[in-house]
Amino acid sequence: MTGPIVTLRDITAETVRTICDLEPYEAQSGFVAPNAVSIAQAHFNPAAAFRAIYADEEPVGFIMWRPWDDSASCFLWRFMVDGRHQGKGYGREAIALWLESLQAQGYRFARLSYLPGDRGPHGFYLAQGFRDTGETRANGERLMELVL
């Protein structure tokens, strides 16, 4: 018996409210912006792309990315799995799907930033193959990179 199939899907007028209602655990809320804010920001950044994360037919998370400062890298701008759906492998599978799509588009690097802290995403990203670059942004976020 296999688990649910994880997919990345467009967010539509019919699904946007459901996606905006997804939230990480309360203790994680300071690490990622609400999905509604992310979707609004993406509409003002023509290079941004975003998708809902589904497990079978159930929305379980959100992912957003954009090209980095060079043409070889793509930046994971936002990533979240609803608290009710964490620990089921959906996040790991969603990142794998995203990385596969980057490779298919010719990117050579995936980059992201995170805020350090308890219950933060650092360990999760390490487990997906990302490595710390040693760089820290002005807002305190630390950068990670994965060679595709």
Which residues make up each language-model segment?
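Conserved beta-strand segments that form the floor/walls of ligand-binding pockets within enzyme
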Residues: 75, 80, 111-113, 143
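Conserved active-site tyrosine of GNAT-family acetyltransferases
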Residues: 125, 130
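Short beta-strand-to-coil "C-cap" segments at the C-terminal boundary of structured domains/repeats
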Residues: 145-148
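Conserved beta-strand-loop-alpha-helix junction that forms the acyl-donor binding cleft
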Residues: 112-122, 138-141
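Glycine-rich acyl-CoA binding loop
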Residues: 87-92
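Acetyl-CoA-dependent GNAT
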Residues: 3-77, 81-84, 95-97, 101, ...
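Conserved GNAT acetyl-CoA-binding A-motif
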Residues: 102-114
